[in-house]
Amino acid sequence: MKPLLTWLTLAALTISPMVHAQATNYPVTVQSCDRSVTFNAAPQRAVSNDVNLTKMMVALGLQSHMVGYSGITGWNKPDPALLHDLGTLPELSSKYPSVENLLNANADFYFAGWNYGMRVGGDVTPQSLATLGIQTYELTESCAQIMPRAEATLDDVYNDLLILGRIFNVQDRAQALVADMQNRLGRVHEQLAGKAPPRVFLYDSGEDRPMTAGRLAIPQALIRAAGGSNVMADVSASWTHVNWESVVQSNPEVIVIVDYGEVSAAQKQQFLENNPALQSVDAVRNKRYVVLPYVAVTPGIDNVAAIETLAAAFHDVAR
């Protein structure tokens, strides 16, 4: 438990009263994975991919700088509140957008990530878009797909919000959002002292081989911050497939089920309970499951809410 408490203590101690942020002085250069990207002005025709990235844009009040979004309804049930906030902005593609989708929208900026709107070796990449006058900022967690990275932490999310704040000259909003997330995390931490971490497995999808989160994916940070121990923390990968044998050997006490896609969370739970190979697993025997939506377990503004839910489930602490 000591590493968890040490990390959370440091996070809590870094919370400081907000000061007025300086306006962005263009041109501004930011780091995006292994690239430096320079912006001469705030983008005016931005596109975000996936629900978690789009919610970051909306939380920063950037709808007036956007021409659309993509990758939401093809994977998730539409969130009425988010759709309301997006107003008349169109969904350019229900899943990953094509180069043509972005060109037809006359986009000048693409906020996406590797496996969050871009694929290694695909047509839509920062390099291919740059030749067309479209600048790209890559989700920090996703950089693990193209370069060596350390264990995922909430600093990855804070980094994305603060960099977006610099790119769009909304640094006050970004800093306020990060401070609120840190303060909520601090309140969770106060309730975790002396509590032993349960063994936790995140089940995303898959029957033959389950998709889960290794230590380079953000659920590693969420589980740890909630006072749990990710049984796949020794897997040096982000979102990845493992075999059921490794799940049985690790014997998780809690299983987190990601609710999205065509297979419901209830169907995923039923599959786990009917899988003969898992009958000895503590979480299955004790029916100890936590269901979280996709948007909560991918990097974004819902991560602290996920931590609050997990902490309540792991340790019966107040939310």
Where are the regions that the model predicts?
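A short, structured surface patch at a secondary-structure boundary
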Residues: S48-A105, F109-M118, V231
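N-terminal signal peptide c-region/cleavage motif recognized by signal peptidases
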Residues: S16-M18
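Boundary of Sec targeting at the N-terminus
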Residues: Q22-T24
